[in-house]
């Protein structure tokens, strides 16, 4: 691990042909069109007999168009010494990481931060992996890995910087919005951009949206920009801070009331204060457990509060009967039967584990009861 990736050089054998100087341009154009010209290195060099055009190593025969112009042309091996600038990310890392270990090729980008999860067998190579990510991705200034699972109440990760500067204050631009955060102190997942857009697309303009576990505001800011009135809450004081900042940055502060309290208390207050049109709970690990507050609030305030549409996210095993599993868990927490619940598969989290979006209407909870005491509808 003592070798700086910038010091690495590799000798690689390419194919080449020699052509008369005056035919260099036309022949090179043919080869480029057919994607046969080398791209890792300078593809035209001087030669005593004219110009040598460097081709990719995989070429086994020349196109007939080239032979028509230069009948005497023939393929010749041509060794080239490649530096780190010309080597690919995988070629650089393979200098350090032996077969059959798999080189990590994907990571989440959060502004200038690259975040990735490394299996145990790659941890000895974490520093050089980080350095190579920065070398081959100029926009990345910080590379971090997660240390253990997310198991604290605030959902933020314990991060280790493996390369670059220790700077977690960053900005992300999504769907025309800007979200600023301290990535080390809040929860953020760039892969949920489409889900944020999809959920907010279901909201009606001028509706009242209550986001009980809002994080730094990906749902709240979008909903407010759409014209909804939003009450956004998160228990994490750092998320609360960045929520307010992001409302200012995106010009929606007037449409968003921000809260920093327990989600159950927040939900109960919404029912006690007349209800709302939507309740969102984007905490897949435990959101289903908070349905008890919705069940209590709906029963207690059935006559006086609007009955919202509830949208919550949850993990489950897709290989089993996830519909029955999600429904059973939801009904247990609610303390009520669910006549209907829409379930949408959001994304694959890990082998066999999926994130689902579950949607139901609180009004449907009372569908089988008599209507002598209808709940308030506005």
From Swiss-Prot:
Residues bound to S-adenosyl-L-methionine: 196, 234-235, 262-263, 282
Domain of life: Eukaryota
Localization in the cell: Mitochondrion matrix; Nucleus; Cytoplasm
E.C. code: 2.1.1.228
Main subcellular location of this protein, as a coarse class: mitochondrion
SUPFAM superfamilies tied to this protein: S-adenosyl-L-methionine-dependent methyltransferases
Keyword Nucleus recorded: yes
UniProt keyword list: Cytoplasm, Methyltransferase, Mitochondrion, Nucleus, S-adenosyl-L-methionine, Transferase, tRNA processing
One GO MF term: tRNA (guanine(37)-N1)-methyltransferase activity
One cellular-component annotation, GO: mitochondrial matrix
One of the GO BP terms on file: tRNA N1-guanine methylation
Transmembrane segments: none
Keyword Mitochondrion applies: yes
Enzyme class: transferase
Reaction(s) the record says it catalyses: guanosine(37) in tRNA + S-adenosyl-L-methionine = N(1)-methylguanosine(37) in tRNA + S-adenosyl-L-homocysteine + H(+)
PROSITE patterns the UniProt entry points to: SAM_MT_TRM5_TYW2
Function, as annotated: Specifically methylates the N1 position of guanosine-37 in various cytoplasmic and mitochondrial tRNAs. Methylation is not dependent on the nature of the nucleoside 5' of the target nucleoside. This is the first step in the biosynthesis of wybutosine (yW), a modified base adjacent to the anticodon of tRNAs and required for accurate decoding.
Family: Belongs to the class I-like SAM-binding methyltransferase superfamily. TRM5/TYW2 family.
Complexes and interactors: Monomer.
PANTHER family, alphabetized: TRNA (GUANINE(37)-N1)-METHYLTRANSFERASE (PTHR23245:SF36), TRNA METHYLTRANSFERASE (PTHR23245)
Protein name in the entry: tRNA (guanine(37)-N(1))-methyltransferase
């Amino acid at each position: 691990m003592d070798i700086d990736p910038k010091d690495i050089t590799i000798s690689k054998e390419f194919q080449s042909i020699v052509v008369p100087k005056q035919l260099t341009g036309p022949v090179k154009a043919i080869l480029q069109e057919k994607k046969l010209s080398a791209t890792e290195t300078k593809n035209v060099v001087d030669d005593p007999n004219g110009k040598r055009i460097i081709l990719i190593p995989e070429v086994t025969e020349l196109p007939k168009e080239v032979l028509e112009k230069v009948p005497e042309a023939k393929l010749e091996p041509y060794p080239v010494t490649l530096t780190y600038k010309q080597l690919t990310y995988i070629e650089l890392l393979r200098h350090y990481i032996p077969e059959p270990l798999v080189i990590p090729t994907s990571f989440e980008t959060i502004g200038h931060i690259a975040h990735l999860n490394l299996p145990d067998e790659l941890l000895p190579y974490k520093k050089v992996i980080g350095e190579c990510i920065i070398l081959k991705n100029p926009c990345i200034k910080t590379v971090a890995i997660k240390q253990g699972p997310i198991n604290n109440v605030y959902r933020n990760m314990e991060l280790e910087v493996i390369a670059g500067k220790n700077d977690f204050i960053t900005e992300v631009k999504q769907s025309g919005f800007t979200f600023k955060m301290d990535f080390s102190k809040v929860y953020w997942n760039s892969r949920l951009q489409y889900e944020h857009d999809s959920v907010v697309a279901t909201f009606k303009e001028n509706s009242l949206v209550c986001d009980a576990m809002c994080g730094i505001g990906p749902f709240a800011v979008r909903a407010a920009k759409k014209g909804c009135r939003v009450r956004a809450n998160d228990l994490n004081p750092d998320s609360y801070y960045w929520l307010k900042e992001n409302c200012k940055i995106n010009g929606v502060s007037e449409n968003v009331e921000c809260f920093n309290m327990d989600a159950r208390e927040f939900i109960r207050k919404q029912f006690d204060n007349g209800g709302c049109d939507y309740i969102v709970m984007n905490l897949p690990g435990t959101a289903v457990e908070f349905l008890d507050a919705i069940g209590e609030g709906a029963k207690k305030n059935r006559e006086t509060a609007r009955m919202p549409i509830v949208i919550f996210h949850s993990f489950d095993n897709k290989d089993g009967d996830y519909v029955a599993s999600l429904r059973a868990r939801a009904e247990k927490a609610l303390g009520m039967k669910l006549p209907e619940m829409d379930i949408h598969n959001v994304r694959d989290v890990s082998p066999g584990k999926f994130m689902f979006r579950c949607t139901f209407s609180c009004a449907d909870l009372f569908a089988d009861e008599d209507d002598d005491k209808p709940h308030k509808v506005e």
